[in-house]
Amino acid sequence: MMLKQNFADQLKAQSEIWKAQVKDYQERVEQAGEQARGEYKKSMEQMQDKAEEARNLAEKVRDAKEEAWKDMVGASQKAFVELQRGWADAVSRFQ
C-alpha cells in the first residue's frame, strides 16, 4: 500500500508542476487571437480547477489519520488519475 506521506507529496509536486504550466499557458492566451482566447480561457479554467483539486486532495490525504487513510487510499488514487486525465484533456486544447 502506498504510504500516505508519499502520496500527499506526489499530489503536491504534481499541483506545483501544473501551477507552472498554467502560468505558461496564460502567457499563450494573452498572445492569442480573440476567438482562440475564448477557447483557451475555458481550458485555463479547467486546468486551474484541476490544480486546485490536486492541492485539496493532498491536504485531505495529509490530514487523514492512518486508519482513515487505509480506507481512502484506493479512492484517492482513482481521484488522482481522474485529475490527470482532466488535465491532459485541457492541455490537449493548446496543442
Segments and roles (model prediction):
Residues K4-F94:
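Amphipathic alpha-helical membrane/lipid-surface binding segments
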